């Protein structure tokens, strides 16, 4: 990786230089975030301009937002039209998701969706984990999807193998 989002926002490179095309999915591009950047908040207006430009070039622009509601959250959400709140069915994660949804409600987004990740039906049956209905009731949103828990996801992340190229319960959710 030669350039990242901060390089792009600081005009150290052109968009085509910062975009990384996925080798397996030719229509999928990424712009890597800077690993360390304390001055990220200085670029909110430039990010908004960049996202506006990307919307003209691409059908979808996904911004992976850090967990929680710190500066990175506000920065990432500033240019969004729509949000997908991803949570696991653990009480603490659902509470955090509830706080995020409350903040998003005040940001004039066209749509806020819910995606439940790392869902373990066996644990739900044993009443050791919140059910999909529990999560939906607590957050006041219907889930657009439920991704089953799968140990192979951890393996794929650690080895850099795209999840969608593996045959797992989680990939079947897509």
Give residue spans per PLM region.
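Histidine-centered active-site loop/cap adjacent to the catalytic His
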Residues: 167-174
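Conserved catalytic-core segment of NTP-binding enzymes
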Residues: 45-49, 53-149, 155
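Flexible, glycine- and charge-enriched loops at secondary-structure boundaries
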Residues: 5, 90, 167
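P-loop/Walker-type NTP enzyme "switch/lid" segment
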Residues: 1-56, 155-164
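Short, hinge-like loop/turn segments at secondary-structure boundaries
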Residues: 1-3, 103-104, 130-134, 161-165
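P-loop NTP-binding site
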Residues: 142, 152, 161, 172
């Amino acid at each position: 990786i030669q350039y990242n989002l901060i390089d792009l926002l600081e005009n150290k490179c052109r968009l085509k230089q910062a975009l990384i095309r996925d080798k397996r999915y030719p229509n999928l591009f990424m712009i890597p975030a800077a690993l360390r950047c304390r001055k990220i908040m200085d670029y909110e207006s430039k990010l908004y301009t960049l996202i506006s430009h990307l919307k003209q070039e691409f059908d979808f622009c996904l911004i992976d937002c850090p967990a929680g509601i710190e500066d990175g959250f506000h920065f990432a959400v500033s240019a969004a039209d729509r949000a997908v709140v991803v949570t696991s069915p653990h009480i603490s994660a659902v509470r955090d998701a509830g706080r995020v949804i409350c903040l998003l409600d005040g940001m004039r987004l066209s749509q806020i969706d819910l995606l439940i990740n790392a869902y373990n039906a066996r644990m739900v049956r044993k009443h050791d984990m919140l059910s999909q209905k529990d999560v939906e009731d607590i957050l006041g949103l219907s889930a657009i999807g439920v991704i089953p828990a799968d140990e192979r996801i951890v393996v794929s992340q650690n080895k850099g193998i795209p999840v969608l190229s593996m045959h797992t319960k989680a990939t079947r959710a897509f």
